[in-house]
């Protein structure tokens, strides 16, 4: 089963009949329009390309306009692709709604995390701070040694250091589907998902469900 592209609306909570509060993220999933179907013969793999939302006419480039027109769909805010499993078929111009998640219990949600700018090792990698006193001068939040000696004489790749934090692709796995509201194009999942309000999200059935 393929996934769908939605938009993060925000967080709220809903109550069960027993009065238990469940924190949920509201994801708006407008109908995903199929812009292209890729086949084994033409492209070397099976996939479906979709768009969603809308884009101002003066923001659509000519190549994009031609691509959307060929599929017979309105220009959307982007293009996303999902690998197509055997036995599932779609046609260009087809619309896929949030109802495909009606029988799904858990989902994986992918988004772009909030950017935190340049962060030190304490914030970025949870390094411990050094002594506040005992002769420590101006080295309370520095990482300490980053290497060994003349051998190997270099800093190894992947060393945890200060640098840009956030604004990267993040996936949260196996979130419970609490409610599917087909009338309002909403999907409610338990817990938090990556990114800021209004950010694009890719929602797929959980691989570990």
UniProtKB/Swiss-Prot annotation:
GO-annotated molecular function: rRNA binding; structural constituent of ribosome
UniProt-listed Pfam families: Ribosomal_L3 (PF00297)
Keyword field: Methylation, Ribonucleoprotein, Ribosomal protein, RNA-binding, rRNA-binding
InterPro entries per the UniProt record, alphabetical: Ribosomal_uL3 (IPR000597), Ribosomal_uL3_bac/org-type (IPR019927), Ribosomal_uL3_CS (IPR019926), Transl_B-barrel_sf (IPR009000)
GO BP, sorted A to Z: translation
In-chain residues carrying the UniProt-annotated modification N5-methylglutamine: 150
Region (Disordered): 133-152
UniProt PTM: Methylated by PrmB.
GO CC term (a single one): cytosolic large ribosomal subunit
Alphabetical list of SUPFAM superfamilies matching this protein: Translation proteins (SSF50447)
Top-level lineage group: Bacteria
Membrane-spanning residues: none
Subunit structure: Part of the 50S ribosomal subunit. Forms a cluster with proteins L14 and L19.
Homology family: Belongs to the universal ribosomal protein uL3 family.
Functional note: One of the primary rRNA binding proteins, it binds directly near the 3'-end of the 23S rRNA, where it nucleates assembly of the 50S subunit.
NCBIfam families: L3_bact
Name listed for the protein in its UniProt record: Large ribosomal subunit protein uL3
Lineage, broadest ranks: Bacteria, Pseudomonadati, Pseudomonadota, Gammaproteobacteria, Enterobacterales
Gene name of the encoded protein: rplC
